[in-house]
Regions:
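Sequence/fold signature of self-assembling virion shell proteins
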Residues: 2-50, 69-77, 82, 94, ...
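Alpha-helical scaffold segments that mediate packing/assembly in large oligomeric complexes
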Residues: 89-156, 268-281
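Structured, hydrophobic secondary-structure cores that serve as assembly/anchoring elements
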Residues: 46, 61-63, 69-70, 75-96, ...
Length: 281
């Protein structure tokens, strides 16, 4: 891409709209991958109770060895970038490309969105329950659909706290103009942190840009304890006048991955049409 040299223009750069991560902070940090490339997560499997016998042997029942399910996570996302800011070009552009500021711009516009998109798409493919619908939710049924997703988690005894519902602005608009909205708390009054837009049925609503959720996925619900996004490397470096360059060299590397942890199969619930790609891991 060409570098446009400024002549009489403002020293401001029109930075594209960007956003902090929608996902990080809403995932579990229970596991540490320091020193390893893969981890195995063991989930114990409990047994049903039986009637106590007041005579005979094994009055509590026949002892059974506790079983478990095993999930393995292998780190696959090893991403990097490299940018140069030539000192001469920057001088001709009124020094508008400050290295630190350009690094932040790169992270906000490229690195963070790429990781968020990967995470949400990964979580959707690992959903324990997929609600298949023939058409997008409408203002007349979107709130009841959210409650249906909550019921799935309730029936699976997923804890009610730390539940999140990711949806596009299109779906969020439908919630706001829905018939049931008048009986709900005003979503805007419950905003807690960047990206959160209130609550419906114990779900903290996270409004994400179009393209973050996988194609044909209308909403994605997660329980924090069921989704992992471990990072092993988060490097962002600025080299001033490195060999072979008069100017700054910006480099970054991010090594991470995502996993949906079993929580009775329903710590992740998504709704989409029949074309939504899904598999159970």
């Amino acid at each position: 891409m060409a570098i446009n040299l400024a002549t009489k223009y403002s020293d401001k750069i029109a930075e594209a709209f960007s956003h902090a991560s929608y996902v990080r902070g809403k995932v579990s940090n229970e596991y540490d991958l320091s020193g390893v490339k893969s981890i195995k997560i063991y989930t114990p499997v409990t047994v049903d109770e039986n009637d106590y016998q007041r005579s005979g042997v094994n009055r509590y029942g026949t002892p059974q060895e506790m079983q478990d399910t095993v999930q393995e996570l292998t780190m696959t996302q090893d991403k990097a970038f490299s940018l140069t800011i030539d000192k001469g070009n920057n001088k001709d552009q009124m020094n508008v490309k400050g290295a630190g500021r350009m690094m932040q711009l790169q992270l906000r516009e490229k690195t963070t969105p790429a990781a968020d998109k990967y995470a949400l798409r990964r979580f959707a493919t690992l959903a324990g329950k997929v609600m298949t619908v023939s058409a997008k939710p409408t203002k007349s049924n979107i709130v009841s659909t959210i409650f249906d997703m909550g019921q799935i988690m309730d029936d699976a005894q997923v804890p009610e706290d730390n539940r999140y519902m990711y949806m596009t602005a299109e779906m969020y608009k439908l919630v706001n103009i829905s018939d049931e909205f008048i009986s709900l708390d005003k979503l805007g009054e419950k905003s807690i942190s960047r990206g959160e837009c209130g609550e419906v049925d114990n779900f903290r609503i996270i409004k994400v840009p179009t393209g973050y959720l996988p194609a044909n996925c209308f909403m994605l619900a997660t329980y924090k304890g069921s989704v992992l996004m471990p990072y092993k490397i988060q490097d962002a470096k600025i080299h001033q006048d490195p060999p072979g360059l008069s100017g700054n060299l910006l480099e970054g590397r991010h090594y991470y991955d995502c996993l949906g942890k079993y929580f009775k199969g329903c710590g992740i619930v998504c709704i989409g049409n029949e074309y939504l790609f899904h598999y159970s891991s």
